[in-house]
Amino acid sequence: MVTLTKEASQVRDALLARGLETPLRGEVLDNEVRKRLIAEHMTEIMTLLNLDLTDDSLAETPHRIAKMYVEEIFAGLDYANFPKITVIENKMKVDEMVTVRDITLTSTCEHHFVIIDGKATVSYIPKHCVIGLSKINRIVQFFAQRPQVQERLTQQIMLALQTLLGTNNVAVSIDAVHYCVKARGIRDATSTTTITSLGGLFKSSQNTRQEFLRAVTHYNG
């Protein structure tokens, strides 16, 4: 069994305590076993769709999908894949807003298993420590690599950063296109969904909140 890093355990425990963890079963199967079983079930699904799996183009598709699910687009279900985090003492006493904009993300709608394609803006006001900027992107990507709803994804990113940085002063906004809306159902090709989660001063201070929302508006503009 893989031993989780301290940071991964802290984030997982914080999400569980707040009821924000992705719904997961307790049983954890070995990755190779999961890939084998997923491939078997995908073979059955494709056969029920009347696809000919003896065709060269389709023969390996169940195995490709299984590998993609376990190792790539759903890798964020396994905290062993939580990014290595570098937290640095705030020796410079930075106390102004730090913002990372235009963080690209691709996730999967947990209702229809189709794409959520979006961008995130993340801000925080440092307290005792700061985080390597690329780590913010990696945390966004980790939680995006799960079956998701956008509301939970936004809150998971915020709570993870609050936990790691030791401050409530974190804000996250995600603007995304949902292919469950674009490619099926109503087939609206132009609508986007924006979800914002605010913590600490971003929620209690009107000036801080407006500064963050201006950063989001600047990106959207």
From Swiss-Prot:
Pfam families membership: GTP_cyclohydroI (PF01227)
GO biological process, one term: tetrahydrobiopterin biosynthetic process
Keyword field: GTP-binding, Hydrolase, Metal-binding, Nucleotide-binding, One-carbon metabolism, Zinc
Endpoints of the signal sequence: none
Keyword Nucleotide-binding appears in the UniProt entry: yes
GO CC terms of this entry: cytoplasm
Binding-site list for Zn(2+): C109, H112, C180
Catalytic reaction annotation: GTP + H2O = 7,8-dihydroneopterin 3'-triphosphate + formate + H(+)
Domain of life where this protein originates: Bacteria
UniProt-listed Enzyme Commission number(s): 3.5.4.16
InterPro entries: GTP-CH-I_C/QueF (IPR043133), GTP-CH-I_N (IPR043134), GTP_CycHdrlase_I (IPR001474), GTP_CycHdrlase_I_CS (IPR018234), GTP_CycHdrlase_I_dom (IPR020602)
Keyword Ribosomal protein: no
GO molecular function: GTP binding; GTP cyclohydrolase I activity; zinc ion binding
Annotated pathway: Cofactor biosynthesis; 7,8-dihydroneopterin triphosphate biosynthesis; 7,8-dihydroneopterin triphosphate from GTP: step 1/1
Subunit field text: Toroid-shaped homodecamer, composed of two pentamers of five dimers.
Family that this chain belongs to: Belongs to the GTP cyclohydrolase I family.
Name by which UniProt lists this protein: GTP cyclohydrolase 1
Gene designation: folE
